[in-house]
Amino acid sequence: MARYTGPKAKLSRREGTDLFLKSARRSLADKCKLDSKPGQHGRTSGARTSDYGNQLREKQKVKRIYGVLERQFRRYFAEADRRKGNTGEKLLQLLESRLDNVVYRMGFGSTRAEARQLVSHKAILVNGQTLNVPSAQIKSGDVITIREQSKKQVRIAEALSLAEQSGFPTWVAVDAKKFEGTFKQVPDRADISGDINESLIVELYSR
């Protein structure tokens, strides 16, 4: 299954919430109607969405937020289910610990897609070593750095400047002048932003 490459705003409208696929710092709320479905006038339906439909919709939303395809998402859920604790919370923690997401949270990319591209293009160092696997799991204490040659990229500087203005998550420490950040710890559920109801995903996979 290929990644979606169409209009990002359409995906946010489909889910009824801003997925921040275009920018983490600029909301789409002022640009388009997030409470209406894609289409000329917004498709409507008189039928009430079933429990299964709501569960499936929530899974699709989270997949789109993190840019993960179905097979990989199932693997994340299976791993979360094996771990002790709340399965839904563990799932989100695994997704948040992906290298591309950490690069995004540190403000080096304005979106997760842009952060993923930086990783794939070998612009990212982890503990001083090039790592070009977006799905790599980052551990507490790992240091993320922009490769020296890539520090000149205007898009990185602009994304970092915007991130500084809006603030960084508490579970990362960023030195913008050095283009460097430290993954302090796996975030608690309360530290993970986003309008996500992970319990619906757990219910879906428990059917």
Curated annotation (Swiss-Prot):
GO biological processes: ribosomal small subunit biogenesis; translation
Gene3D superfamilies in the cross-refs: Ribosomal Protein S4 Delta 41, Chain A, domain 1 (1.10.1050.10), RNA-binding S4 domain (3.10.290.10)
Origin: domain of life: Bacteria
A molecular function (GO) term: rRNA binding
Swiss-Prot/TrEMBL keywords: Ribonucleoprotein, Ribosomal protein, RNA-binding, rRNA-binding
CDD domains reported in the protein's UniProt record: S4 (cd00165)
S4 RNA-binding domain mapped to chain residues: 97-160
Ranges for region Disordered: 33-54
GO cellular component: small ribosomal subunit
Pfam family membership, one: S4
Biased composition (Polar residues): 42-53
InterPro entries: Ribosomal_uS4, Ribosomal_uS4_bac-type, Ribosomal_uS4_CS, Ribosomal_uS4_N, S4_RNA-bd, S4_RNA-bd_sf
Function text: One of the primary rRNA binding proteins, it binds directly to 16S rRNA where it nucleates assembly of the body of the 30S subunit.
Family from the record: Belongs to the universal ribosomal protein uS4 family.
Subunit structure: Part of the 30S ribosomal subunit. Contacts protein S5. The interaction surface between S4 and S5 is involved in control of translational fidelity.
Record protein name field: Small ribosomal subunit protein uS4
Gene that encodes the chain: rpsD
